């Protein structure tokens, strides 16, 4: 299901690369999409609290993987949290919070590797991919990423998503205000 969930983001990244890259230079776009992320998190938390019987992992089929994958594709836009969008999609579909989070983080692996390969291709062949600094950077990123995911899984299991929504709203408003100055 991870491969199926990766397809929408892969297609969006390839087909709309230039469009998404143009958004990164716009503070207004970043601020707006942070507000959108906040609403996704807030809305999915509200929906999730109303669903009494959560869906088990066996219900994570092709349809659900594609829907969550489309949420991941939206996160190519700056300000849309990839994990926030995919976890929210899982909660909107009725999955338990921990399952939605675990699937979100599994989906991140091919998405991040694919984005890295595209960036490496764009940077060019002159880059030394096996240099000591590249290996050290990869190792540091892998270790810190693992620790961050463990921490976030624990946090998501024990707390609600409202705090993340409030953070996105506050940051989005500050960025939009800065864009107006």
Curated annotation (Swiss-Prot):
Principal location class: membrane
Pfam families: BacA
Keywords: Cell membrane, Hydrolase, Membrane, Transmembrane, Transmembrane helix
Topology of the protein relative to the lipid bilayer: Multi-pass membrane protein
Catalytic reactions of this protein: di-trans,octa-cis-undecaprenyl diphosphate + H2O = di-trans,octa-cis-undecaprenyl phosphate + phosphate + H(+)
Enzyme Commission number(s) from the entry: 3.6.1.27
Keyword Cytoplasm attached: no
InterPro entries assigned to the protein according to its UniProt record, in alphabetical order: UppP
Any one GO molecular function term: undecaprenyl-diphosphatase activity
GO cellular component: plasma membrane
Transmembrane segments: 23-43, 105-125, 129-149, 161-181
Cellular location(s): Cell membrane
Job of this protein: Catalyzes the dephosphorylation of undecaprenyl diphosphate (UPP).
PANTHER family the UniProt entry points to: UNDECAPRENYL-DIPHOSPHATASE (PTHR30622:SF2)
Family listed: Belongs to the UppP family.
Protein name: Undecaprenyl-diphosphatase
Gene name for this UniProt entry: uppP
């Amino acid at each position: 299901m991870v491969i199926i969930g990766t397809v929408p983001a892969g297609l969006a990244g390839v087909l709309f690369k230039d469009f998404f890259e143009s958004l990164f230079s716009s503070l207004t776009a970043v601020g707006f999409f942070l507000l959108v992320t906040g609403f996704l998190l807030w809305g999915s938390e509200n929906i999730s609290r109303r669903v009494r019987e959560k869906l088990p992992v066996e219900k994570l089929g092709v349809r659900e993987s594609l829907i969550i994958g489309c949420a991941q594709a939206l996160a190519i836009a700056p300000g849309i949290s990839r994990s926030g969008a995919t976890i929210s999609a899982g909660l909107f579909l009725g999955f338990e919070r921990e399952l939605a989070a675990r699937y979100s983080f599994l989906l991140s692996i091919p998405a991040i590797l694919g984005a890295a390969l595209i960036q490496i291709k764009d940077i060019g062949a002159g880059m030394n991919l096996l240099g000591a600094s590249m290996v050290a950077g990869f190792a540091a990123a892998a270790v810190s990423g693992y620790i961050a995911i463990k921490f976030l899984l624990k946090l998501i299991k024990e707390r609600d998503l409202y705090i993340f929504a409030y953070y996105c709203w506050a940051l989005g408003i500050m960025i939009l205000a800065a864009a107006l100055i």
